[in-house]
Amino acid sequence: MVREEIAVATGAPRWKCVESRIDSKRLYYSRFILSPLMKGQADMIGIAMRRALLGEIEGTCITRVKSEKVPHEFSTIVGIEESVHEIVMNLKEIVLRSNLYGTLDASICIRGPRYVTAQDIILPPSVEIVDATQHIANLTERVDLCIKLQIERDRGYSMKTPHNDEDGSYPIDAIFMPVRNANHSVHSYGNGNEKQEILFIEIWTNGSLTPKEALYEASRNLIDLFIPFLHAEEREIHLEDNANGVPLALFTFHDEFAITNIRKNKKKMALKSIFIDQSELPSKTYNCLKKSNIHTLLDLLNNSQEDLLKIEHFCMEDVKRILDILQKHFGFDLPKNGK
């Protein structure tokens, strides 16, 4: 087993990039550390940062395609290898870079025979193509491909109703997230009361921004969310005079069953957010669990001791170590069998 040595900062916590690479024009990767942190802080920051990276950063996408000569999305055009639906799906994958808001227009107008790629899109000056080689269509004959595009900037997902409007336009399910994936893990070091933590964060982006830019953007968004608390002032509020009030349903003791279900769901969501690589498991135990598709604390708690012993290369010593960690950090236990 190869152990990695990381230079740990002293004093105030500091960020550092320990690994960075470009796998392709549409896949950037970086790994960062934040240290030193007090016990419990790394997990708290890691969970918040991961959610901000995946859900709070904005991206630019093609959200609508318009072609007056096409009767419906699943039709074909003579002289074009792909169906209209396949062309729309290819346009959905185009990665764009822009800082402007609102709806922007773009277009493609090409005559075959030739391949049509992202570089053939006529864009406004404020929008850039990340990978000009992305395939759109193959015109096999002397035919024209003329389509209009709508570009928007947003965050998260935008699910569109699968239908074409009367003007011949087709909405696209857009994925605005420039961060493809983000993981975090925690490493503890030190002894006794002086135990501290290092937070590791891995970020993969689609090339429209670098992982470092994504980390900065996510951090800024989190800070913006907390700023109102820094300026909060206690003052008497008369709810009956508030014209902007929102009616809230009051819980009564008759809603005890509903409250219990809400608590269970919150607990389940929390367990899903805790990954086993955040625990103090040896690499051998961790790898065995990963191969058995056990990735989170919730996955682990859905197994009994008997189930774990069925995992290849797993022994009773591994199970005991897991039981100790569950009891020590979470107050949980595993049943001996699945009955």
UniProtKB/Swiss-Prot annotation:
Reactions this protein catalyses: RNA(n) + a ribonucleoside 5'-triphosphate = RNA(n+1) + diphosphate
Main location: plastid
Protein location: Plastid, Chloroplast
Alphabetized Pfam families for the sequence: RNA_pol_A_bac (PF01000), RNA_pol_A_CTD (PF03118), RNA_pol_L (PF01193)
MF-aspect GO terms: DNA binding; DNA-directed RNA polymerase activity; protein dimerization activity
Keyword set, alphabetical order: Chloroplast, DNA-directed RNA polymerase, Nucleotidyltransferase, Plastid, Transcription, Transferase
GO cellular component: chloroplast; DNA-directed RNA polymerase complex; mitochondrion
CDD domains: RNAP_alpha_NTD
Region (Alpha N-terminal domain (alpha-NTD)): 1-233
EC number(s) reported in the record: 2.7.7.6
Residue segments, region Alpha C-terminal domain (alpha-CTD): 267-339
Primary role: DNA-dependent RNA polymerase catalyzes the transcription of DNA into RNA using the four ribonucleoside triphosphates as substrates.
Domains (record comment): The N-terminal domain is essential for RNAP assembly and basal transcription, whereas the C-terminal domain is involved in interaction with transcriptional regulators and with upstream promoter elements.
Family annotation (HAMAP family): RNApol_bact_RpoA
Subunit structure: In plastids the minimal PEP RNA polymerase catalytic core is composed of four subunits: alpha, beta, beta', and beta''. When a (nuclear-encoded) sigma factor is associated with the core the holoenzyme is formed, which can initiate transcription.
Protein name, UniProt field: DNA-directed RNA polymerase subunit alpha
Species assigned in the record: Piper cenocladum (Ant piper)
Encoding gene per record: rpoA
